[in-house]
A protein has these predicted regions:
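A short beta-strand-loop structural module common to alpha/beta enzyme folds
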Residues: 50-61, 181-186
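A short, flexible beta-alpha/helix-coil linker loop
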Residues: 28, 149-153, 187-190
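Glycine-rich phosphate/pyrophosphate-binding loop and the adjoining helix
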Residues: 3, 15, 157-158, 162, ...
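Short hydrophobic segments within beta-strands
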Residues: 24-26, 55, 146
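N-terminal beta-loop-helix "entrance" segment that forms/cooperates
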Residues: 57-78, 195-196
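Residues at the starts of beta-strands that form the adenosine-phosphate
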Residues: 19-20, 51-53, 141-143, 179
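Helix-loop-strand module that forms the ligand-binding subsite of alpha/beta enzymes
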Residues: 79, 83-166
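N-terminal beta1-alpha1 ligand-phosphate binding loop
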Residues: 16-50
Length: 210
């Protein structure tokens, strides 16, 4: 089910253009810190006057499993999009993409990884021209990730920090946005209440400026 929240354009700016954002959230616990980050993102963007498609993958019972048939038909454009047509349409409608997720085992949660596998398809997120990947989501002009790591940034760097690279390189490449933000709270396992509050405030500020 699509959950769209529409903010009110600032009265002081009659030329204000509403931006439509897709927020992808991937955490199973409603009382988690990640859920608080998700709420802060959606509320801040809505308060800016943006239209927000709030896509909570767990709440929507998204199936992250790529089927045998989907894999076999992966390159069959446009038929490849039919199993996830509604999500493809939501992605294609987005002018901004914000991903809110925890980093587990130095990677994406399976729910979010499955979304990328099933929805970021040939003919949707990219085109293959002479064997080269060309961006196909160039209507997305703003890209952000809001995430938490259990370990320190040094530990993440030692294994290459795959989530950061995937957002700032792979996802960035198929969008080519004007603005990109990667907001991470590292060492979450030892974060204090002040650390968490400070990061929540930072996320709010960054979403106002995205």
């Amino acid at each position: 089910m699509t959950h769209i929240r529409r903010g009110s354009p600032p009265k002081s700016d009659p030329g204000f253009a509403v931006t439509h954002a897709l927020v992808l959230a991937a955490h199973p616990m409603k009382d988690s810190f990640n859920a608080a980050l998700h709420t802060r993102v959606v509320d801040t963007l809505t308060d800016r006057g943006w239209s927000v498609d709030d896509c909570d993958l767990y709440a929507e019972n998204f199936d992250p499993v790529l089927s045998d048939a989907e894999r076999r038909g992966y390159h069959d454009v446009p038929e490849n999009r039919s199993p996830v047509e509604s999500y493809v349409e939501r992605l294609e409608a987005a002018e901004a993409l914000v991903m809110v997720f925890p980093v587990w085992n130095f990677g994406y949660p399976a729910m979010l990884k499955g979304f990328l596998d099933r929805v970021f398809l040939p003919g949707v997120s990219f085109r293959l021209e002479d064997g080269k990947v060309k961006p196909n989501l160039t209507q997305i002009r703003r890209l952000a990730a809001v995430t938490t790591y259990g370990g320190t940034r040094l530990r993440a760097m030692l294994v290459g920090d795959p989530p950061r690279k995937c957002v700032t390189r792979a996802v960035w490449h198929v969008c080519r946005p004007r603005k990109t933000r990667y907001l991470a709270l590292y060492d979450m396992n030892r974060a204090t209440a002040d650390d968490r509050a400070g990061f929540l405030s930072k996320v709010g500020r960054e979403m106002k400026d995205l």
